[in-house]
């Protein structure tokens, strides 16, 4: 991989220059002024008056730049003083840090000043971070400072998957872990707090496997370098993702405001400039020019071109562009396959494109809703791996490992203050006669899940106990997602408990504080006190008229909204400003505040409510003259089983998307074919696309695409096709490589440690054998593996032997077998690994030991065996050679 220079010295404007303007370029400053002026009415409605604030010229221009481009949620939810204080903190950091005088104006403006990194909740993290970090790095070089800040982040948090709502940096630290998007948000915030330009980079979807990833680039002395957030390495441009990133199709970042850097611009919006940095990671990439034509072959201007990567069994949209007057647009990507979807005025077309082989592609708008498109089969091939790794000495690696172990100890000391399973159960038993019967364990689970937020939860429960509503408090907590338990303050919970509906109500559709992915906020007391009685009556008794009220009274500003940055429902009421998502949340929040059942459907993401007059469920359509019950039909999928796949999983093996406004939108089901579609399932009427795919061990996918229509009152029957390619190794399941187990060393009875599989195996392929002691199937497995010892050692990847119980391990004698030197030993923790394998591989009663899995750290299983199996060793060798 390479770093990328972004500095043209002749044009550089250093912060120590003589300009008294925040933006030295007169033309760009005028453009910002014009863009801010276009928002003047919005700022007035939001109560923002920059002229009334006591600021210097540079401070005012900085805030004008921010307010010209910040998303609606940030305009409305935060006071101007919040952004002014952060500007002043930035100036302090640039003045006090030795590299501050060398940061160019452009990089300062776009990659240091903005508080927002992605779609996280904004907080005051920068103040906390600066106080901790400044003394620690003030005498370092800029490059060493970047590495040191990442070590500091590792002290605070490690990786753990979670839901799509992005925690604030302080919430991530409070929890002591976060998913990659949260870790990278934390690191960017930390780097910016000390005046180092930083940006979050992400591949929206991997091409060779499911999921995605986010990391960080930091600007150091004129170049951009990358690093894995909270995963410190001895040098920059190194992370576990070097190899997979070399197989990436697209890497991009959203730059705040209008940006004129050297990178390829994917698109410009009213808020940000999306840039493509694939060339930093993929040694080879190429551009493809797309021409969109109508059914007569004429170029189409303004057609929407969507670039899609196969991931999680759907063609996931990763970039959008519009065609020019000649019907053309282009995108640079890694050398693999993408699906290109084009649409305009109710017509669409699509084509698989191979980057590196095709330079110009023409796609016609040849289809429309309901088109009888033929069954389509295709192979989708990702780029080949071509990683470039920087040199790291043994001494550097050893020192980095030593530091990481120390940082783990600091973080673990903090985590030790959280509830454990035992202490949480002891706490819950104090109230055992006040909860519903036998709820001790569930309350204990809530306390463990609250992590560093446990005091907010226990204070909430204590007060509820004193007020005689403990059981209701428990029910409220049961409606929350785990992330809500980790970052929701008591004040928010109090609002939803004490101002919730009296008497019996729907927990899910009235009592629950959550609507979509928003940060939980208090609003019930406010709405009950501030919404006039006449409107409250409308909400309660004529809900369809409240839908109309929302349409007539709220100014919609989707053009300046950012996904997942929703407005506080109270501020929607106060300002009468909203975007689509915020209006939906506001509608549901107001309904629930007045005991009307309302919710967002988890599959279709359509807002629904139950009308108290007829108790029917209505879909909310803010543009309709009247609200109606949506027409329904049914879908049944037939499936002819292929080897090792008797029940395909949704969003692993297949997915369904509905055609809406020219695009196919994923329907968010959870389950398997047998659970969802073996029998006819009710669905909204409409035009749909069914995508299924068999992922091979090399990352390529053999996909099948079907189109169908659901008609009112009718059952549509379609075949779910899973292609089986006999001469290639297929991904057959999932294995959680973050699964914990007790690591042991034979002959050293006391040398134990709790580790994840990933910690033991490192990135790449591995094998796991979950075994008991002394049974014939397990002994045969050990002998089969011993028989191919040399071949498995030549493979070089770790083999983890995990005993089902400690007693099994104590009886085991390693000297009885000639196992490969690559074998590691461990003990399953309370059967958790066995349960996980049984669940993922659809086994009954935990499966038959031994359970043998070969997988990789993208959690893809390519080999599985259970119980007695002849030739196990040869099968493992054969599979390993084919990978």
Question: Where are the language model's segments positioned?
Answer:
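Short active-site neighborhood of thiol/selenol oxidoreductases, capturing the structured segment around
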Residues: 756-785, 798-802
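A short, hydrophobic beta-strand/beta-hairpin element that forms part of a small beta-sheet core
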Residues: 847-866
């Amino acid at each position: 991989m390479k770093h990328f220079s972004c500095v043209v010295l002749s044009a550089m404007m250093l912060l120590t220059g003589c300009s008294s303007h925040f933006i030295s370029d007169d033309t760009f400053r005028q453009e910002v002024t014009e863009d801010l002026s276009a928002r003047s009415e919005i700022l007035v409605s939001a109560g923002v008056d920059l002229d009334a604030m006591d600021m210097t010229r540079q401070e005012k221009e900085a805030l004008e730049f921010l307010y010209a481009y910040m998303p609606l949620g940030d305009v409305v939810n935060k006071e101007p003083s919040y952004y002014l204080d952060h500007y002043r903190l930035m100036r302090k950091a640039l003045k006090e840090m030795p590299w501050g005088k060398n940061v160019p104006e452009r990089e300062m403006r776009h990659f240091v000043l903005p508080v927002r990194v992605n779609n996280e909740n904004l907080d005051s993290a920068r103040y906390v971070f600066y106080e901790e970090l400044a003394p620690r790095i003030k005498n370092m070089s800029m490059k060493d400072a970047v590495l040191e800040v990442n070590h500091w982040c590792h002290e605070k948090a490690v990786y753990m998957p979670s839901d799509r709502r992005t925690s604030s940096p302080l919430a991530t630290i409070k929890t002591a872990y976060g998913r990659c998007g949260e870790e990278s948000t934390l690191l960017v915030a930390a780097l910016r707090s000390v005046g180092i330009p930083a940006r979050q980079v992400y591949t929206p979807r991997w091409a060779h496997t499911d999921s995605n990833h986010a990391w960080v680039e930091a600007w150091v002395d004129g170049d951009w370098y990358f690093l894995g957030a909270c995963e410190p390495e001895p040098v920059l441009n190194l992370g576990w993702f070097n190899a997979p990133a070399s197989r990436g199709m697209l890497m991009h970042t959203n730059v705040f405001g209008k940006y004129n850097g050297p990178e390829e611009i994917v698109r410009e919006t009213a808020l940000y400039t999306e840039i493509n940095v694939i060339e930093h990671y993929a040694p080879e990439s190429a551009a493809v020019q797309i021409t969109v034509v109508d059914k007569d072959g004429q170029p189409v201007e303004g057609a929407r071109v969507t670039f899609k990567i196969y991931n999680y069994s759907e063609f996931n949209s990763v970039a959008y562009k519009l065609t020019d007057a000649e019907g053309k647009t282009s995108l640079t990507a890694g050398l693999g396959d993408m699906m290109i979807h084009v649409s305009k005025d109710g017509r669409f077309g699509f084509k698989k494109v191979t980057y590196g082989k095709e330079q110009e592609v023409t796609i016609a708008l040849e289809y429309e809703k309901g088109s009888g498109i033929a069954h389509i089969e295709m192979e989708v091939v990702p780029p080949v791996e071509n990683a470039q790794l920087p040199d790291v000495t043994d001494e550097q690696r050893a020192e980095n490992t030593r530091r990481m172990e120390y940082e783990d100890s600091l973080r673990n000391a903090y985590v030790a203050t959280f509830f454990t399973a035992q202490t949480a159960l002891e706490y819950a038993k104090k109230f055992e006669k006040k909860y519903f019967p036998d709820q001790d364990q569930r309350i204990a689970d809530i306390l463990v899940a609250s992590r560093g937020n446990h005091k907010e939860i226990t204070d909430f429960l204590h007060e509820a106990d004193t007020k005689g509503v403990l059981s209701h408090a428990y029910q409220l907590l049961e409606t929350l997602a785990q992330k809500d338990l980790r970052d929701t303050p008591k004040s928010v919970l109090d609002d939803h408990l004490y101002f919730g509906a009296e008497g019996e109500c729907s927990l899910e559709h009235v009592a629950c504080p959550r609507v979509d992915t928003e940060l939980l906020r208090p609003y019930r007391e406010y709405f009950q006190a501030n919404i006039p009685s006449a409107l409250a009556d409308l909400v309660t008794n004529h809900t369809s008229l409240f839908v109309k009220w929302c349409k007539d009274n709220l100014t919609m500003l989707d053009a300046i909204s950012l996904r997942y940055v929703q407005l506080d429902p109270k501020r929607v009421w106060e300002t009468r400003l909203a975007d689509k998502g915020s209006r939906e949340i506001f509608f549901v929040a107001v309904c629930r505040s007045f005991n009307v059942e309302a919710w967002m459907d988890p599959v279709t993401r359509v807002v629904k409510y139950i009308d108290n007059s007829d108790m029917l469920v209505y879909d909310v359509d803010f543009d309709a003259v009247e609200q109606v019950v949506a027409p329904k039909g049914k879908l049944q999928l037939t499936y002819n089983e292929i080897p090792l796949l008797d029940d395909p999983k949704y969003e692993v093996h297949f997915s369904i998307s509905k055609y809406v406004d020219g695009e196919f939108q994923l329907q968010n089901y959870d389950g398997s074919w047998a659970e969802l579609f073996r029998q006819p399932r009710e669905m909204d009427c409409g035009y749909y696309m069914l995508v299924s795919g068999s992922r091979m061990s090399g990352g390529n996918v053999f996909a099948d695409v079907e189109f169908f229509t659901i008609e009112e009152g009718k059952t549509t029957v379609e075949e779910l096709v899973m292609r089986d390619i006999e001469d290639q190794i297929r991904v057959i399941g999932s294995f959680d490589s973050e699964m914990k187990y007790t690591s042991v060393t034979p002959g050293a009875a006391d040398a134990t440690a709790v580790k994840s599989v990933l910690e033991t195996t490192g990135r790449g392929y591995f094998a796991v054998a979950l075994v008991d002691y002394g049974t014939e199937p397990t002994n045969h497995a050990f002998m089969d593996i011993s028989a191919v010892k040399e071949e498995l050692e030549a493979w070089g990847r770790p083999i983890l032997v995990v005993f089902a119980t400690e007693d099994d391990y104590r009886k085991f004698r390693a000297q009885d077998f000639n196992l490969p030197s690559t074998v590691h030993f461990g003990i399953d923790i309370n059967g958790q690994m066995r349960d996980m394998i049984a669940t993922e591989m659809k086994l009954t009663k935990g499966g038959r030991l031994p359970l043998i899995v070969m997988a990789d750290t993208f959690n893809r299983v390519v080999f599985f065996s259970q119980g007695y199996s002849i030739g196990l060793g040869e099968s493992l060798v054969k599979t390993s050679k084919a990978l």
